[in-house]
Regions:
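Active-site entrance/lid segments in N-terminal catalytic domains of soluble metabolic enzymes
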Residues: 3-131
């Protein structure tokens, strides 16, 4: 059989096939299936700062308590980031191939904060989704 091993962004891959960021890569068990199917790495579904803020806004739009705004925004942000970190940890526990996290932010401090937390969660690399 042909040896398809390669290196991408410093990661050693068994082949150059990478499951790209999508709703399909948002589940640890499905990611294990991708690994079994032969992909060389997985890019997890992107964590979008804008999506986190939109979820907060939707929760607050009909609220009669504007003073709760800061609390709700921070709660939603922490919850969404923690869910993403759990996705990384669970996928890393199930898979032996490189796991690449992906973030999209528009505030400088969130790029840095999210990246640090993702590194600590064990992602092998980080895609900066800057579309």
């Amino acid at each position: 059989m042909i040896d398809l091993k390669t290196e991408y962004a410093g990661l050693k891959l068994r082949n150059p096939l990478i499951a790209g960021s999508s709703g399909m890569t948002n589940n640890p068990e499905r990611n294990k299936e991708f690994e079994k199917a032969g992909v060389g790495a997985i890019v997890l579904k992107s964590l979008f700062e804008e999506q986190i803020e939109m979820q907060s806004s939707n929760l607050l739009k009909d609220s009669d308590y504007p003073e709760a705004s800061d609390y709700v925004q921070e709660y939603v942000k922490v919850n969404q980031v923690n869910e993403y970190l759990e996705l990384i940890k669970k996928t890393k526990a199930l898979c032996t191939i490189p796991i690449i996290a992906s973030i999209n932010c528009y505030k400088a401090d969130n790029w840095i904060d999210f990246a640090r937390q993702i590194e600590l969660a064990g992602a092998d690399a980080l895609e900066l989704n800057v579309f």
